């Protein structure tokens, strides 16, 4: 399965539209005003799905998240923490599932692991007016975690520049 996360061009805050393989809007992520990055996630029917919020005043980029599957099948709660590394990106995910994420040196390609097995890959599409990421995943229950990780990655990249 595939998702396309595309940042909105005219937006006061970081906001994203997330499309499925057919080009239909599947989720909308809306940025909110605050001292640090904060996002709310909505499904295609504008129902609240969850939130992602950066912890302010920390040495490492840390995001707390709380999302519920739209079908009501479960909730993900935890944090995403960027580790200090020299050449590649390493992100630790503390939640009720065993996820980890590693990125390439320029920060354009990422691999997500669940229980030490590859569950998703992200790649940044270059030559677009806005930040655009493609997410490939196999298991539908990893979909919301992919969205959380992509939004956190983009916020980290935005903060570093």
Model feature map: region roles:
Residues 1-161:
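Intrinsically disordered, low-complexity proline/glycine-rich segments
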């Amino acid at each position: 399965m595939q998702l396309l996360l595309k940042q909105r061009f005219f937006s006061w805050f970081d906001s994203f539209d997330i499309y499925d393989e057919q080009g239909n809007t599947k989720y909308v992520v809306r940025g909110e005003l605050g001292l640090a990055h904060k996002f709310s996630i909505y499904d295609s029917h504008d129902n609240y799905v969850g939130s992602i919020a950066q912890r302010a005043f920390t040495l490492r980029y840390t995001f707390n998240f709380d999302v519920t599957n739209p079908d009501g099948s479960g909730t993900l709660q935890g944090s995403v923490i960027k580790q200090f590394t020299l050449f590649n990106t390493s992100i630790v995910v503390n939640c009720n599932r065993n996820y980890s994420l590693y990125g390439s040196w320029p920060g354009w390609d990422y691999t997500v692991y669940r229980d030490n097995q590859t569950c998703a890959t992200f790649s940044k599409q270059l030559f677009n007016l806005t930040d655009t990421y493609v997410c490939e995943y196999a298991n539908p229950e990893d979909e919301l975690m992919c969205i959380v990780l992509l939004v956190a990655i983009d916020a980290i990249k935005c903060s570093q520049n």
